[in-house]
């Protein structure tokens, strides 16, 4: 009878040990998804996880999540912030910039370092890149007349995309495309006679 009890006790202990190991693996192993990658830092250096997973020990490691989805950021330039064109006209412009972190370890690492968790929320990301996008719009608008912008929207978008993509490339982001939603001449009240 002792031998049977010993076997049952061994089976129970083995099952308990397996349950504890499975629980620890579930708790310590972090997986990335198609929408969210992460960068693990701490012991053994940096590890970028784009598809797959890694062990994360809470005391020794820190993780920074990086959103991999394409985010749409609307930039409005109107009123006293309207663009000034080559012919000194004021243009009110609404554009959408589509940006994301490319699935490249270097880009994910850079985005984690420069942007942190802001890549997960369009509003927080807008705070970081809005000025860069507005500068690109202003720079290209200053080289073209209002009529040229209207007639050559494709060229305007191409130049804005080039300048904006270079500007945000240092943050780990890549610009997919720019879309002009609306383009109008600003009301005459917005003109400064001086």
Task: Describe these PLM feature segments.
Residues 1-194:
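N-terminal hydrophobic membrane-entry segments
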């Amino acid at each position: 009878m002792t031998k049977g009890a010993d076997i049952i006790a061994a089976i129970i202990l083995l099952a308990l040990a397996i349950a504890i190991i499975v629980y620890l693996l579930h708790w310590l192993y972090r997986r990335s998804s198609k929408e969210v990658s992460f960068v693990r830092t701490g012991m053994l250096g940096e590890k970028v996880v784009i598809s797959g997973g890694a062990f994360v020990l809470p005391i020794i490691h820190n993780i920074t999540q990086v959103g991999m989805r394409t985010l749409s950021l609307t930039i409005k330039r109107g009123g006293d912030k309207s663009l000034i064109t080559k012919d000194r006209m004021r243009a009110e412009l609404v554009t959408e910039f589509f940006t994301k972190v490319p699935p490249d370890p270097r880009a994910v690492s850079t985005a984690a370092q420069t942007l942190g968790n802001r890549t997960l929320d369009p509003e927080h990301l807008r705070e970081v890149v809005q000025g860069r996008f507005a500068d690109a719009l202003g720079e290209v608008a200053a080289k073209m007349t209002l009529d040229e912008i209207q007639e050559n929207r494709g060229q305007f978008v191409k130049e804005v995309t080039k300048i904006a993509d270079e500007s945000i490339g240092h943050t780990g982001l890549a610009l997919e495309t720019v879309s002009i939603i609306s383009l109008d001449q600003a009301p005459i009240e917005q003109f400064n006679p001086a």
